[in-house]
C-alpha cells in the first residue's frame, strides 16, 4: 500500500486481516516511483490485489483553475491517470492468475462536468484504461475493476473546493459503505 501518510498506513495495517506491505510516499514526487520499483525488485512479491485510489480534483472553470496555478491541471492528470498507469505497470509483473486490480474512477467518468472538466476527463481515462486492460488480462485471469462511486464523504471535497452547498453533503455516501 502506497500513501503519503505513514500513520494512516500503520492504522490500516492494524485494521485489516491480511498481510500488507506499506510504503509511505507521495505519488506526485518522481523519486517515489524509483524507490517503489527498487523495493519491488528486492521483494519479488506475489501481489494478489492492487488498489489504485490516489487522486484529487479541483472545482472551478478551466480558466479559473489555470489562474490559481499553472500546474494544477497537469498535476491532476499526473496523479489521477499517469500515477495509476505507472503503478499498474510496475506491479503487473508480480501478479499471477486470480490477482485483481481495482481502480478508483468516479461517476464523473460518465459525462462531462462543467467546473470539474479535467477531473471528469481524468476519471474517464481511468475507466477507459480499466476496461481495456481488463480485456487484455482476461486470458491471464487477472481481473480489473473500475469503481465509479458518486460523492463519498472524504477529504476530497475539502481539497477540491466543490462542497460549497451544504445540501450536497446529503447525497454523500460514507467511505466505509463504499468500501464494503
Regions found by a protein language model. Name each.
Residues 88, 122:
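Active-site helix of classical SDR
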Residues 128, 134-180:
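SDR active-site lid
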Residues 106:
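Residue(s) in the substrate-gating loop at a strand-loop-helix junction
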Residues 16-31:
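Rossmann-fold cofactor-recognition segment
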Residues 1-11:
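Conserved glycine-rich Rossmann-like NAD(P)H-binding loop of the short-chain dehydrogenase/reductase
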Residues 112-120, 132:
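Active-site loop-to-helix junction immediately N-terminal to the catalytic Tyr of the SDR YXXXK motif
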Amino acid at each position: 500500500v502506497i500513501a503519503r501518510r505513514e500513520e494512516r498506513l500503520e492504522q490500516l495495517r492494524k485494521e485489516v486481516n491480511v498481510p500488507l506491505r506499506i510504503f509511505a510516499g507521495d505519488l506526485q514526487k518522481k523519486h517515489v516511483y524509483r524507490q517503489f520499483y527498487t523495493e519491488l525488485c528486492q521483494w519479488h512479491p506475489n501481489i494478489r490485489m492492487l488498489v489504485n485510489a490516489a487522486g484529487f480534483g479541483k472545482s472551478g472553470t478551466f480558466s479559473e483553475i489555470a489562474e490559481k496555478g499553472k500546474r494544477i491541471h497537469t498535476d491532476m492528470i499526473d496523479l489521477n491517470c499517469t500515477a495509476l498507469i505507472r503503478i499498474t505497470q510496475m506491479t503487473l509483473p508480480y501478479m499471477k492468475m486470480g490477482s485483481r486490480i481495482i481502480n478508483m474512477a468516479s461517476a464523473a467518468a460518465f459525462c462531462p462536468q462543467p467546473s470539474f472538466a479535467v477531473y471528469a476527463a481524468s476519471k474517464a481515462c481511468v475507466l477507459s484504461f480499466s476496461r481495456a486492460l481488463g480485456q487484455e488480462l482476461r486470458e491471464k485471469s487477472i481481473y480489473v475493476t473500475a469503481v465509479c462511486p458518486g460523492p463519498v464523504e472524504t477529504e476530497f471535497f475539502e481539497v477540491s473546493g466543490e462542497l460549497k452547498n451544504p445540501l450536497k453533503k446529503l447525497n454523500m455516501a460514507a467511505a466505509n459503505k463504499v468500501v464494503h
